[in-house]
Every structure is written in C-alpha cells, then in structure tokens.
Amino acid sequence: MNQQWNQYIQIIKQVVKPALGCTEPIAAAYAAAVAKRELGCQTPDTIEVRVSDNLFKNSMGVYVPGTGKIGLKIAASVGALAGDPNAELEVLAKINQDDVTAAQQLIDEERVSVARIDTQELIFCSVTMSAGEDTVSVTISGGHTNIIQITRNGVVTFDAPQQQRVATGSVCEGVDISIKQIYDFALQAPFDDIKFILQAAELNSSLAQEGIDRGYGLEIGRTLKGNIEQGLLGNDLMSRIQMMTSAASDARMGGATLPAMSNFGSGNQGIAATMPVVIAAEAFQSSEEHLARALIMSHLGAIYIKSYYPPLSAFCGNTVTSAAASMALVYLAGGTFEQSCYAIQNVISDSSGMVCDGAKSSCAMKVCTSATTAVRSYLMAMGNHSVKNQGIIGDEVEQTIRNVGSMVRLGMPYTDKSIIDIMSA
C-alpha cells in the first residue's frame, strides 16, 4: 500500500475513535481524571474548570453518561473521583451510582467551579485541582484529549512538543487529498487494511438499538418506529435510516452508557457518517467488504470536508458529514463517481444553513434531518440531478467544499458569539 493511503488510514484512526458521551463535557472529565492521577489524592479539596466559549456551549444541555445529570461540574467531579485517566474519551465507562453520589456531594459543598475564559482556541479545557498544599493543573487544547501541559505546584511536569499542539482541524494539512482520491482509496485499498472501520458499524448500531429499546432524550427514533408500526410511515429505506440514525443520537445525547464511534471529535457526526450507510447496506444486501469501503468513504470524506473549517463553530457539522454519507450511499447503490459528487453537492445545497446551538437532546433532530437529506440527495444523484452554480454551490464539488470552509471561517464567528450570548443570558 502506498504512502498516501497510509496517511489516509492514519487520519481516520486519529479522529474516528470510540467516545462515551458528548465529547465536550468528556474532555473536562478526562482532564479531571488525569489531574487526580497526577495529584495522587483520594478526594480533591477543590476542582476548578476553565473552558472556551465553544466547549462551554456544547456542555450546557447534554447528559453526562452514567450520571443522569447535565453539565461540566458533574463531568469534572465524577471524572476526578472515578474516571479512568488511561481511557481518554471512554474515561467514564466504569463509573457507578456511588461515584455519582460522591461527585454530586462535592458540587453541593461548592468545591467544584466552572468558568468561561477568553481564548482563541475553540477546544480548550483546563482543570486545576487541589488537595492539601498541592495543586495540579491539566490543560487540553486543540483536541478533546490533546493534553498540552501539566503543572504541579506551579512547576511544568509535561509540556507537549509544538507538533502535538496543532488542532484536530489540521489533520489534512500537507496531505494530498481530495474527494476523487478518497473515492479511489475507498474502492481500491486492500480490504484487510480498512476493515477496522467496521467497528463503527458495530458500536453505532448498538447505540441505535439502545435508543430504540429505551427512552432517551426526545425519543425521536422510538417515535418514528411507532409511526411505522401504525402505518403512518412506510417501512422503507428513508424511514429506517431516519429511525435508526436518530435513535443512536437519542441514546448518545441522553446519557446512555454505550460508546459511539465518533468522527472529528463528535459522536453525533460519527453516527451521521455511519448509520445511513449501515442501514442502506442492509437494504442492498451489501457484503461486509462493500460496507467497509462505504464507511471509509463516508468517514474520510466527512473528515476532509470538515478540515476546511474549525472543529467547533456556529455551523452544524452533521450537514457536511451527511454529504459524505450520501456519497457512500451512491457507491452502495452502484452509482458512479460523478453521481457521488452530485450527492455531495445536493446535500450541501439543502442543509448548509443549519447552525450549532450547543449539544443537547434536540441534536438528534438535526442528525435525523441531515440523514434525510443524505437519502434524498443520493436518490436525486442516481437520477443524474445535481445542484450546480447556485448560491454557495460551485461548478464542481471541490469548489463547493472550499466555499463551505470560507462561509464558516469568515462568515460565522459573529453568529457563534450571538448564539453563545443568547444561551448564556
């Protein structure tokens, strides 16, 4: 396998990871778990959490898995008391109710505080923890588990090299990559080298079933299932993709203690890149190899498109993630590369106006909307219908992707500030 394809695999493995719970509060839980390990105490006296505006925004309304509670305070507190510092995004996988009770007691005793800080970093979390005369600070920046510095009593004990301080959004920087190259890689790479991506299907399908079996969040998946059973909706490809994709997001945002396979630091975007592809593969009776190739196309395509703008912004990343999923649906249906590009163009034209107003249970509605667009756009593409040279949609797909990046980077920072101000009022 050539060096370029090896780079693609490393990119996927770097940003497509299992994650338990919404990754923004989990970043605080992880930092707290590491701080507790470095401090070497049983129970800290105080925990101070400082975060960027965007990390704060995405932690305000989402349940922390295994706790039944919302917010950064409980995430940091339970992470400090019972988190596994070696588990990264699955830091809270082994907590129990006693841990949650003890964590809530720390909060009730006003020993846990959270503050927003002014920083240019979109993903930033610093946890300072004290016990007796000792104080430890752990700082995460650029990625949800990317620790850049640890200090103990003011002395730096770990300082990440400069290359480790780059943000998740720069994973494609300096890499020769395009939609055509992603398509060719997905179709031609040796199956043994890419079959690891099938874990995404396993994890996110289990999460979807959890969302169907139990009531989480707005119960969108369960509602759609009931409508199908009543005959109000057809039991067809569109309805099943809507049902299972939103069910996975219901469980994810509702605090289920099952991991999602994330994409670009987002569990919901991992779901959006995975579940439409999995359900379509079942409908088309695709082989395991075809499913793996479609998932590679969807996940790497999503990573590539999102590399043109910051990982946290006012733009809902499920939209362009679903564009990559739609591309993969065309592949599974036997379409051409040109039709795959049509699908991407159609999705971005349809749903690129969706904003991110924080992580919460209603994100499952946006995931469902994006998945719906992915299916409709794939169907249009298979009929050789594509948006072109309208609005932000360029003459070809690479220009459209660059246009999305420009819109988010240059046009949406003020929107982001306005959303955060509204949510914080």
From Swiss-Prot:
InterPro entries recorded for this chain? Ser_deHydtase-like_asu, UPF0597
Organismal lineage: Bacteria, Pseudomonadati, Pseudomonadota, Gammaproteobacteria, Vibrionales
What's this protein's name? UPF0597 protein VIBHAR_03081
Q: Which family does it belong to?
A: Belongs to the UPF0597 family.
The GO annotation for biological process reads: L-cysteine catabolic process to pyruvate
Q: Give the GO molecular function terms.
A: L-cysteine desulfhydrase activity
Highest taxon in the source lineage? Bacteria
Residue pairs linked by disulfide bridges in the UniProt entry: none
Q: Which Pfam families match?
A: SDH_alpha
